[in-house]
């Protein structure tokens, strides 16, 4: 077996990174966008970024969101994952220094955990809605049948 000198190895890219990229863009793109915007607000409000730089990053994020066609975007190996795809777009538009500043004071683990919590919240909310519907139906049925005899 020949050694592969660059990242990612084609097998790893095909079997791990490409499916992860597809999943991230399909299920988590909106969460990535919300996290980026919330983090940008924090960076500006704490003075880590000045208003002008924060504004330029916000405009670039708006442009990226408006221009990206997630259905057409495929994993190419140019970047490791969806996180780096957005970062690469910011750097392309704003330069490497300003484009990289959005990631000041956070880690990919922070982002991953936040995304998973956001996705879990959606599922919990849906389950709670179903439980409320079931509880209402059971209460309605109990009230409708309150004079019915139940034979044991």
Kindly give the residue locations of the regions a language model identified.
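A helix-coil-helix interface module used to build multimeric assemblies
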Residues: 1-152
